[in-house]
Amino acid sequence: MSDRTGIFAGDDPFAIARDWLAEAERSEPNDANAIALATVDASGLPNVRMVLLKEIEPAAFVFYTNYESAKAIELEQAGKAAFVMHWKSLRRQLRVRGTITREEGPQADDYYASRSLKSRLGAWASRQSRPLSSRAALMAEVAKITAAKGPNPPRPPFWGGFRLTPVEIEFWADGAFRLHDRFVWRRNSAGESWVIQRLNP
């Protein structure tokens, strides 16, 4: 008999992740949807940075970025990534590992259109991860793009989403005296059934 009750109840890890995120959005002071996204470069050297998770789909996690950024290049070279979400207010953590594919269709268009005008223009102006001579140069590029693109800029061809389809999802909750609760969902590839295990703290 499973002892996965309360916040761990249920067999669908995406449903549990959505529930945890919804709870975190009520208690975290800001950016409850922030993830620390880990990638590796061509030499195998790891990189990590904060990114905002924008959707938990029925079978994947979606975020958006500049396709010319260091993270995007590393994502596409490796085809794999991992992230962690940590909520201090809940004393909980979610870890995810899996494969990466682009999302550059209507879903990406819709998300881009939902952003503020300044954020949409900023996506055009920023050549993410490339050297920048000064902030003044960046703001000059924003002004140039604003004049050229107007009030309804289309999604840049170099900007869009990535979908992480997991092969491992781990839920962690703080316990007294470091006796934490950890449950992991694992499978070898997307489409396979999950194997669920409790882990030692």
Swiss-Prot record:
Free-text remark on how the cofactor is bound: Binds 1 FMN per subunit.
Annotated metabolic or biological route of this protein: Cofactor metabolism; pyridoxal 5'-phosphate salvage; pyridoxal 5'-phosphate from pyridoxamine 5'-phosphate: step 1/1; Cofactor metabolism; pyridoxal 5'-phosphate salvage; pyridoxal 5'-phosphate from pyridoxine 5'-phosphate: step 1/1
EC number: 1.4.3.5
Alphabetically ordered keywords of this record: Flavoprotein, FMN, Oxidoreductase, Pyridoxine biosynthesis
Named cofactor requirement(s): FMN
SUPFAM superfamilies: FMN-binding split barrel
Binding site for FMN: R49, M50, V51, L52, L53, K54, Y64, T65, K71, Q93, Q128, S129, W172, R182
Binding site for substrate: K54, Y111, R115, S119, R178, L179, H180
Top-rank lineage group of the source organism: Bacteria
Family, as annotated: Belongs to the pyridoxamine 5'-phosphate oxidase family.
Subunit structure: Homodimer.
Name recorded for this polypeptide: Pyridoxine/pyridoxamine 5'-phosphate oxidase
